[in-house]
Amino acid sequence: MSSTDDRRFEVLRAIVADYVSTQEPVGSKALVERHNLGVSSATVRNDMAFLESEGYIAQPHTSSGRVPTDKGYRQFVDRIADVKPLSTAERRAILDFLESGVDLDDVLRRGVRLLAQLTRQVAVVQYPTLSASSVRHLEVVALTPARLLLVLITDSGRVDQRIVELGDVLDDEDLARLRGLLGGALDGKRLAAASIAVSELADEAPEDLRDAVVRSATVLVETLVEHPEERLVLGGTANLTRNAADFTGISGFPGSLRAVLEALEEQVVVLKLLAATQDAGTVTVRIGEETQVEQMRGTSVISTGYGAAGTVLGGMGVLGPTRMDYPGTIASVAAVARYIGQVLAER
């Protein structure tokens, strides 16, 4: 890349930094005063004219400065050399807060709340996907001789509790045999495979336990084939309203803040944005129209996968106006995802 291109990028970087900080269009005079660009005001004006002609910046009003476009933000993000690191104290605080979660639900809720606070954006996390989870343990508890409580625990921390009404009563010995049959069919299997295994138990069960096995298997299959990946935890929605000015005046897109809020209520839209993020350790940035969601034209989505022991369990990230602190937000998303995975791996 030529020195001219490098200089023009520095001008673009300065425009992005000032606009993110002030929310005001940026002029050449302000750039020269605030940044050590090492060139004259005339050169900066010429560079800004070039950036505008190439679509990296735009003039929102006749007599104002310039603001970055989606293309400009993309160029800026693609050339971020160093993501702003979190301090040791911040990393320790994140881990301590997440480790205090009592179960999967609590850890994910804490993660979303934390990410929303760190980034001042809307944070979202997807529950562990069905295909990624395995059965860690099945507990069978007799509530009465004719009623059982099944507690299914996955390696991702998901816990499901279901009641089984029996046709016949079971004594302690029969209960232990049933527990062994069900546990043997399920333990360690991915949920899809576990569903098949438990559905085949009826043909193999001893005659005196067949009714209890069939009833238990029916409940378990229903549990195993549900889709927890359709569940989302959302936090920080109020941050959108605090940034309401960023969603006004988007050409051809009136009422955009309302449209974004409505899109957030449609979980399928958010799930679509997280669907391509099933890679822990890699942060994806979608800016404006790159989201390919009409209601999200004025937003950016920064997302990644989280997981444990090399397995990606789900996606998570933040959503906010395109005018955001990209280096800081990328660092926060990566850190919270990494520590959620670490906490889940230890359980």
Curated annotation (Swiss-Prot):
Q: Which Pfam family would be a valid example here?
A: HrcA
| Leader sequence segment | none
The source's domain of life comes to Bacteria
Alphabetically list the UniProt keywords: Repressor, Stress response, Transcription, Transcription regulation
Q: Provide the GO biological process annotations.
A: negative regulation of DNA-templated transcription
- GO molecular function terms attached to this record: DNA binding
HAMAP family xref list: HrcA
Summary of the function given for this chain in its UniProt record: Negative regulator of class I heat shock genes (grpE-dnaK-dnaJ and groELS operons). Prevents heat-shock induction of these operons.
The UniProt entry's sequence similarity note says:
Belongs to the HrcA family.
Q: What is this protein called?
A: Heat-inducible transcription repressor HrcA
Q: Which organism is it from?
A: Rhodococcus opacus (strain B4)
